[in-house]
Amino acid sequence: MKKYLNICNIYILLWCIYYLQGIVYASGGMISQMTLVLLMLISGYYFIEVNIRYRIPSFLRVLNVFIGVMTIYGVILLLDPLPLIGLYTTHQVSKLEFIKSIYISLLPIYSMYAFTKQGILKIESIQALTLVLIISTTLSYFRAEQEALQKALEAGSMQEEFTNNTGYNFLQLFPLLFFWNKKPILQYALLAFIFTFIVMGMKRGAIMIGLVCLIWFIYRTYKSSKSNRSLIIFLTSIAIICGVAYLIDFYNNSEYFQYRIEQTLEGNSSGRDSIYGSLWQYYINQESLINVIFGNGAAHTITAIGVFAHNDWFELLICQGLLGITIYIAYYISLWQNVKRKRNNDLYYSILSMCLFIMFASSLFSMSYNSLSISIAISLGYTLSNENSTY
């Protein structure tokens, strides 16, 4: 029992408790607030410790800059006496949400890095934590379904199927499956479970990213396996047959999924093209060079066109200008450099390269830098901490 009572497991358990708000306890209440405060204190402590104690890889150095810049913008937003209100609404948007979402997304990477350096976070514990995270993500999925159904009923709609953003959280569980390489049968069972929920979520971006991750996962597990290649081929064949059968059945029995596929084939981006076009016109028509370089301030997209960008790059361009874009490009370049240094280690290379792809692709279809889950933090923290080459 004692070996499970360490700061790492307690930290991840607290994240699971936080994710379960609205399922086992009320959202936004005392429990969730106290849990988040405790998590931020622990995360902040390890952010400082990692930077003081260790010679960190290039990605974390760039991440330091990114977090620092976003903190400055977040503080300026909080100090602004004017309320944050959308262009076409009188509803106020929480100013605290901007910096809170970034801290929740990015600070856990440092904690996982420190836990690995200290020898607390090991593959055996990651395997157990993977199961816990799959369970909590599944519960979150059904909570989101119930909330969407309730809103539809309140609006007088008879709609019973919805897109579910939890599909992106399932997507971020993918890299953790590489840690199960010595248990291929269970590994592929978990793979099937995760991908099923990605499809059920009906987020087209998540499904497309998931398909690429699926191909990469199969390729890397086959290439890195020396003694179980026949089993890998067999499991892959079973997965393909079952997957195709499931997709056909799901398509035939889900009118909403058919509608989403038809939208994709017709090039319908759910209004994203209009949003991006409006944001681009807003940016190029700015007269102030300061706004072009440094942006208009945190969360400015909602005051500029009435909605958030749903795309990291346009959100940064409008809010943090060329400064934000430049740092974000460096963010991905530095992570790619760390990926290349892992080529001599099959496990680390497979995990880190998939993390890079998920993060970058998500930044194009949705939001990434403020939406990373503890799953990605575990994968990044563990592999970056186990760097076995020079920085």
What are these regions, as identified by a protein language model?
Residues 200, 221-263, 284-285:
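A membrane-periplasm/extracellular boundary helix in multi-pass inner-membrane enzymes
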